[in-house]
Design a protein with these regions (language model features):
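Cyclophilin-like peptidyl-prolyl cis-trans isomerases
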Residues: 15-201
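Sec-dependent N-terminal signal peptides
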Residues: 4-13
Length: 201
């Protein structure tokens, strides 16, 4: 009996230690619209460019918070639940970027729909920490996103930028540096624990 109680205590303590402190994550940030990706390696916080890419930001937020229906790739049925929580970073390349947002975990999945690009004049891949939509050609955005760790000017006008990392770029650096296979997939899964969204007024 005492042994079982001790095990339960340890599990409870671990769960409390793993609790996500949303206030701490967004503390100290100026007025704006933000998202945070909580991972095994730490938390990545980025500003959402709602003015420059309104459709893209709304799509990301609605999927993240479970406000939008998407097609489960395994059942073929439409579901309405939090999309990104529990997904992995399925593609990581050192000195380039980390990619996530595939419900199948192999880069071939999406939400079951596509939408058009949003290119805002002057918003380019001129710095690390750009958050953008992955695609397979013009106007094929869905749910997959990537975060850069270096300037990537060759991606200008090819991928919609909808955010900029403001905290946790070092976390992205850690993720892109993990051992990976020939497809650039991490040998040990890097999970998204939760995606948070916060508007600071």
């Amino acid at each position: 009996m005492k042994k079982n109680f001790f095990i339960l205590f340890i599990i409870s303590s671990f769960c409390l230690a793993q609790k996500i402190d949303e206030k701490k994550i967004f503390r100290g940030l100026p007025k704006g619209y933000y998202a945070a990706i909580v991972t095994d390696f730490g938390t990545i916080v980025f500003e959402l460019y709602e003015k420059q890419a309104p459709k893209t930001v709304k799509n990301f937020v609605d999927l993240a918070l479970g406000k939008k229906k998407w097609v489960d790739p395994y059942t073929g049925k439409k579901v309405k639940k939090r999309f990104y929580d529990g997904l992995i970073f399925h593609r990581v390349i050192p000195n380039f970027m980390a990619q996530t947002g595939c419900p199948k975990g192999d880069g071939t999945g999406g939400p079951g729909y596509e939408f058009e690009d949003e290119f805002y004049e002057g918003l380019i891949f001129d710095r690390p920490g750009r958050v953008a939509m992955a695609n397979r050609g013009p106007n094929t955005n869905g749910s997959q996103i990537f975060i850069t760790v270096v300037p990537t000017p060759w991606l200008n006008k090819r991928h919609t930028i909808f955010g900029q990392v403001v905290k946790g770029l070092d976390v992205v650096e850690k993720i892109v540096s993990v051992p990976r296979d020939f497809r650039d997939k991490p040998l040990s899964p890097v999970y998204i624990r939760k995606v948070l969204v916060k508007r600071i007024k």
